[in-house]
Each structure stands twice: as C-alpha cells, then as structure tokens.
Amino acid sequence: MENAKMNSLIAQYPLVKDLVALKETTWFNPGTTSLAEGLPYVGLTEQDVQDAHARLSRFAPYLAKAFAETAATGGIIESELVAIPAMQKRLEKEYQQPISGQLLLKKDSHLPISGSIKARGGIYEVLAHAEKLALEAGLLTLDDDYSKLLSPEFKQFFSQYSIAVGSTGNLGLSIGIMSARIGFKVTVHMSADARAWKKAKLRSHGVTVVEYEQDYGVAVEEGRKAAQSDPNCFFIDDENSRTLFLGYSVAGQRLKAQFAQQGRIVDADNPLFVYLPCGVGGGPGGVAFGLKLAFGDHVHCFFAEPTHSPCMLLGVHTGLHDQISVQDIGIDNLTAADGLAVGRASGFVGRAMERLLDGFYTLSDQTMYDMLGWLAQEEGIRLEPSALAGMAGPQRVCASVSYQQMHGFSAEQLRNTTHLVWATGGGMVPEEEMNQYLAKGR
C-alpha cells in the first residue's frame, strides 16, 4: 500500500498504527447488536444448524466403526469441557489482573480423529459431500444405516472422486484423514507454515501433500485452480464455505448440553464470555454463530489473533474485510501460531458475523508460548501455540472498564461470569515438538 493511502487509512482508523507496530491490541466492537438484529446478515438459520446436527447423527454409526476412538461416544465427535482454576490463579498472578468469575477450557485440542477444532468443520464437509454423491447415485437413502459406507462397494464408488483443500495444517489433517478413510483421492495444498509432522501424518494416510513456499492464501488459490480442471474434484473452500461453517456451528447446542449437564447457568445474570482463536475465520465464526443460537444475547464472543496475522481485526475494524490483507499494511504474516497464519480474512465470515462479535484482540507469539508453559505446569494440559490465543482474553475483558460500561455489566454479573477459552489444537503434537514449544515459554 503506498504511503498516502496508508496515512489516510491510519488517519481514519488510528488503531491500525498499533497493528503495524505489532503491538498487542484490543478492540471492543462498537457495532455489536442483538442476535435478532444481527442474525439476518449471516444468511444461515437455526434450521441449517439442525440439518447439520441431523447429518452428523446419520453418520455416527459409520464414524463409530471407521474410527475406533469415536466408538465410546457412539460416533459423535465432541470434546471435554473442563474448569482450569490453577491456570486462572496463574494468569492473575502473572498479569496482576483479577479474573472475575470462573475460567473454563473447551478441549477441541483433543477432539478424536485429528486433534483440533477442524475435526468439526473439515470432517463435516467431507461427510456432507460423500452423502450427496451417494444419494444422487441411488446407493444410499437417508434412512439407511450409514455404516454400510464402509463396504468395498462404496470404497470403489468414492475412489472415482477426489477432494482438494488448501491449509496451514489442521484443516488439511481433518479433511485428508476423513477423505482417505471414505475412499476419496485427496490432495492437501500446504502453506509454508505447515508443520512437518502434520504433512508426514497426512502422507501416512495415503494423502497427496503439495507444499508451497508461500503463505496460506497461495495454497488455497493453487488448490482451487487444480480442482477446477477436474470435474470429479471437489474443492473445500476454507475462505467461503457455508458447509464448513455449519459443521463448526453444531458446537453451540453441544456446549449448551454440556453446560446443563454440569449445572452451569447462562442468562442475563450469569453471562458467558468465549474466546476463539481466529485464522481465516471459518472455525471461530461457525462456533460463534452456533453459540449465539444456543445462548442468545447472554454469550459474548471474542476473536484472538497473532500480532503478525491480525487479518480479521483489520478487515472488520476498517470495514474492508477481504479487500485488505495484513501484507498490505506491511505486516509479514509470520507466526509460530501456524493455524492462525492467515493474511486475508474470509469476506463471508467477517460480513456475516461482525454484528455478533463483541471484540477482537492480538497477542504476540511469546505470550502464547508463555501461556502454553503455564497451562502445562498448572493443569497438565498441553496445547499448540495457536490454541493459547484465547487464553489472553479474560484479562483484556476484566481490565476494560469501558467495555463493561458499554454493555452495562454490573459487578454482580461480572462475579457470575463464565470465561470459556476455546483450545483449538495440540492433542496430536509429537513429544519432541511439544518439548520445543515448552522450552520457549518464560
């Protein structure tokens, strides 16, 4: 971006100056509205989420047999919800900032099959595509026991088709493993940030991995191009896919059930704050949409991004969405949080969700490493750096009197708050890699 343009952008949006300086930045969204007002802009409804829920239930018998690790839950891919009181104390001590209410962790980091939040959206979109093909071919009806998809006949049928996706790692892992298990030929286009172990794991499942020297945007573009030349190839578009988004959104109702099971109340007097790491935006956007449908205006969602990849904060704050990238303002998009190394946000998610998100913030790689170490020490839970992005949220919210006043929170409400950090990945990180992460914390 030429200087004059840059100066006028900063004059209009002074916060951009802090982003350019790679400062840890927090922006509370003044444009937040009620669910009733914001919902029409999403372009999807509660019915769409129910359909996704039903589809996952139809596939449950198949998943229970296809992946032994899902047998115990009857083929439902869901993660634990745990309180992390020792981590809460540690954060308060390290940051000299009390966190009112209770701190919880949602362990999508340990979801079965692929060990990340992408096991929600990625697997769902592969299943939705497989179902569509099998129904159209007359090989399947909605009332069938879907475990029949494991038969050689179906493997043979699906092998005529291929799937392609561009990824920084975790989405590729989910889509690659699932597609290969069903019988699709699958190619994952991996950006420069992708970890070597993720590529190796994919190849061990018979997935074709194409590696790029460039970032996420290039990997997605190349994947899209390669798929266009083959009519039997389906490209899963992380930037714009409504199907992926709906796969994530099912988490809302599931979390509501977990809260009920644990006797946790969410209402006007007991607000829920949820902190979601954000890359291109599909995962956190879909989850936030599902949470809003489940808890209405009593849930407040925040997106967390690396200081080197603040694409969603930049896009929503300036209103430019996918028309601007972090590279345009001189930021390099290089971060240890490989799952969040995205320079240009999803235009679909930003525009759909901007009225339903309470805020956005950035944090440095070092902050993620520090918190990664503290969580391992205090709670014995090991995550990858990206998954710690949400952990900085509770301090930011509790420290901001202006945000609390903007929403009219009383001291009583804040005392009754639940802070939920969404841990997005790390359950499958190899030991030696994890030890390198732990060594970087202070």
From Swiss-Prot:
Catalytic activity: D-serine = pyruvate + NH4(+)
Gene Ontology MF annotations: D-serine ammonia-lyase activity; hydro-lyase activity; pyridoxal phosphate binding
N6-(pyridoxal phosphate)lysine PTM positions: K118
EC code: 4.3.1.18
Keyword Plastid: no
Broadest EC class assigned to this enzyme: lyase
Subunit structure: Monomer.
Family recorded in the similarity comment: Belongs to the serine/threonine dehydratase family. DsdA subfamily.
Protein name: D-serine dehydratase
Organism expressing this protein natively: Shigella sonnei (strain Ss046)
